[in-house]
């Protein structure tokens, strides 16, 4: 959805940077837009263009256009990242249940979930912000809904794995052990091809930068990729 966020802001005459678009990744999508409009540079550009600061009606207008754009392309981006299906299969063989939280709405997940399942990823349960009164990440409530559905009573038996700062905050707010996945993460913002085109030293530097962000947000540990999870669980 990165491109959809950028295109929506461009439609309103604001050119966001890649960092501004990616910083709120993982949040409920309308909260993502709300957060971007509060960013000092974007807010100042909006005021310069429209003669006033961004308002809630602007949030809703941007989100309406964003949702329209996203729904038309979402099926193209619903596949799991490399290694996810295999890792989930291995975890299930160890008797571990798989739950999921998302920044997508139920309407969006009606497209994403079936497409992801076709491509090998289907969690036992998933919950969107629609199921928790729009209190998505970094609120912990989607994790608690997963625990309820899976019959878990102790947060010490839960491991949250995510690739955005809001994922990390969600996990820590829920009181569960939380890992950040570095390579291929929204926080890194590189495609697999872009990452592999970097020199070994550049890859190391980018990984360290992302890991530091996750640890600063409270992550208990960082892992380079999801396959590394099997070494710790």
Residue ranges and their predicted role:
Residues 76-77, 101, 135:
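Glycine- and other small-residue-rich loops at beta-strand/loop junctions that grip anionic moieties
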Residues 24, 101-103:
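Structural motif
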Residues 1-85, 89-94, 110:
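N-terminal helical cap/lid subdomain that shapes the substrate entry/recognition surface
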Residues 85, 89-90, 105-233:
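Asp-based, Mg2+/Mn2+-dependent phosphohydrolase catalytic module
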Residues 18, 100, 222-224:
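A structural preference for short, hydrophobic beta-strand core positions in alpha/beta folds
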